[in-house]
Each structure stands twice: as structure tokens, then as C-alpha cells.
Amino acid sequence: MKEILYVKVRKCSKDDKVECFQIAETFKAKIIDYGKDSVLLEFVQTATKNDAVIKLMKEEFASIEVVRGGSVGIESISMMER
């Protein structure tokens, strides 16, 4: 089961942004928004992987905000069956 996790890195420098983009690429995250001094990332993965992301982000950056959305279930349907 996967869950949604949003991490906002605040008060980040240009080097911090580069690091955020590398983390996003490694964990297959989406960059939802970025500004002059912040980056917002969206992760959709298992709770265990999201725990690892949070731990890493806390170690790497001084100021982060975390929002977890809980488990997500997605059903696939075929349009041909309708």
C-alpha cells in the first residue's frame, strides 16, 4: 500500500535546491512547487520509504514541513469493458 507525503523545504539556498532535485530524482518524487527560498516535493511510496525520506530530509535541511496523507488505493479500470 502506498501513501502520499508532502515535504516543503524552507529557507533553502541554491545548493539546497540542487540537493532537493537530486533527492526527488532518486525517490521518484514530483516537484510540486519551488520559489526563491523553498521547494515542495510530493512522494507516493510505501510508508517505510516515506519514513526514510523524512529521516533524510531532517538530516539534510534545517527547516522542513511534513504532511502525510495516509494510504492510497487506486483501482484500475478498462474503458473497453464499459
What are these regions (language model features)?
Residues 1-82:
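Long, contiguous binding/interaction regions
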